[in-house]
């Protein structure tokens, strides 16, 4: 989860988020090199007294500033396409959950189980227990097993919402009349927080998302207890 004064990303919990972090570092390094080169050229021009007023056409320079940006764009595009295809790929999910956005709460339905569905509301500040996080805790968490592919179907009952969990690299729009899907696989257990990431009305900031990722054995016990 995020911490006060944090400048970087949250710790990656899924393979997708790890790829996104690698791509971010890769792109940031390219931007740093380009910025350093441009700054060096600017400083060179400001400090040099040499002026070339008779140079109307330099074929070599034109080739360099045409070919070099093309190579840079290819170096950015290839890992970007790899990550995009990885995010869109769905390989035999073992569990499917339907997530519906409402003003202003989430509802979850485990479609592989009978009558396993619930609403998830934010816990108000005066109802928080010691150690719980303001504006991020909910009364019913989405519980999922770790190390297994899970498909999440996302839609909305009223207006536009967005179901987002940063540490898993997830952000999917919830659009009325449209069913979007995303796959997640967690590499470790824990509590992971997210929020609605689309302005959806007066209480937009009061739509937290809490994923509780547990080993498969505990998930089976939890689902069996709710089914009873």
Swiss-Prot record:
Q: Does the keyword Coiled coil apply?
A: no
Q: What is its EC number?
A: 7.1.1.9
Instruction: State the source organism's domain of life.
Output: Eukaryota
Any GO BP: ATP synthesis coupled electron transport
Name of this protein:
Cytochrome c oxidase subunit 2
- What InterPro entries does the annotation carry? CcO_II, CcO_II-like_C, CcO_II_C, Copper_CuA, Cupredoxin, Cyt_c_oxidase_su2, Cyt_c_oxidase_su2_TM_dom, Cyt_c_oxidase_su2_TM_sf
Q: Which UniProt keywords apply?
A: Copper, Electron transport, Magnesium, Membrane, Metal-binding, Mitochondrion, Mitochondrion inner membrane, Phosphoprotein, Respiratory chain, Translocase, Transmembrane, Transmembrane helix, Transport
Record bears the keyword tRNA processing: no
CC cofactor: Cu cation
Q: How does it sit in the membrane?
A: Multi-pass membrane protein
Q: List the disulfide bonds.
A: none
Transmembrane portions of the chain = 15-45, 60-87
Identify the residue ranges that face the Mitochondrial matrix compartment according to the record.
46-59
* Residues that bind Cu cation A2: 196, 198, 200, 204
Which residues are involved in binding Mg(2+)?
A: 198
Recorded GO MF terms:
copper ion binding; cytochrome-c oxidase activity
Q: What does this protein do?
A: Component of the cytochrome c oxidase, the last enzyme in the mitochondrial electron transport chain which drives oxidative phosphorylation. The respiratory chain contains 3 multisubunit complexes succinate dehydrogenase (complex II, CII), ubiquinol-cytochrome c oxidoreductase (cytochrome b-c1 complex, complex III, CIII) and cytochrome c oxidase (complex IV, CIV), that cooperate to transfer electrons derived from NADH and succinate to molecular oxygen, creating an electrochemical gradient over the inner membrane that drives transmembrane transport and the ATP synthase.
Q: Which Gene3D superfamilies match?
A: 1.10.287.90, Cupredoxins - blue copper proteins
Q: Where does Cu cation A1 bind?
A: 161, 196, 200, 207
Quaternary structure annotation from Swiss-Prot or TrEMBL: Component of the cytochrome c oxidase (complex IV, CIV), a multisubunit enzyme composed of 14 subunits. The complex is composed of a catalytic core of 3 subunits MT-CO1, MT-CO2 and MT-CO3, encoded in the mitochondrial DNA, and 11 supernumerary subunits COX4I, COX5A, COX5B, COX6A, COX6B, COX6C, COX7A, COX7B, COX7C, COX8 and NDUFA4, which are encoded in the nuclear genome.
The species this protein belongs to is Loxodonta africana
């Amino acid at each position: 989860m995020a911490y006060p004064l944090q400048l970087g990303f949250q710790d990656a919990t899924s393979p997708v988020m790890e790829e996104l972090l690698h791509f971010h570092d890769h792109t940031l390094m390219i931007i740093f090199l380009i910025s350093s080169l441009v700054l060096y050229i600017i400083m060179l021009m400001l400090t040099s007294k040499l002026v070339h007023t008779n140079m109307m056409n330099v074929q070599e320079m034109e080739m360099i500033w045409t070919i070099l940006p093309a190579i840079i764009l290819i170096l950015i595009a290839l890992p970007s396409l790899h990550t995009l295809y990885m995010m869109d790929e769905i390989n035999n999910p073992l569990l499917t959950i339907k997530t519906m956005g409402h003003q202003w709460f989430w509802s979850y339905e485990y479609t592989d189980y009978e009558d396993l569905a619930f609403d998830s509301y934010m816990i108000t500040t005066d109802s928080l227990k010691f150690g719980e996080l303001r504006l991020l805790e909910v009364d019913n968490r989405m519980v999922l097993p770790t190390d297994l592919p899970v498909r999440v179907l996302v839609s909305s009952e009223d207006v536009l919402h967005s179901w987002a969990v940063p540490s898993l690299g997830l952000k999917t729009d919830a659009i009325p009349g449209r069913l979007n899907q995303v796959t997640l696989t967690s590499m470790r257990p824990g509590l992971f927080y997210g929020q609605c990431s689309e302005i959806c009305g007066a209480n937009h900031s009061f739509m937290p998302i809490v994923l509780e990722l547990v080993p498969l054995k505990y998930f089976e016990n939890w689902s069996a207890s709710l089914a009873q």
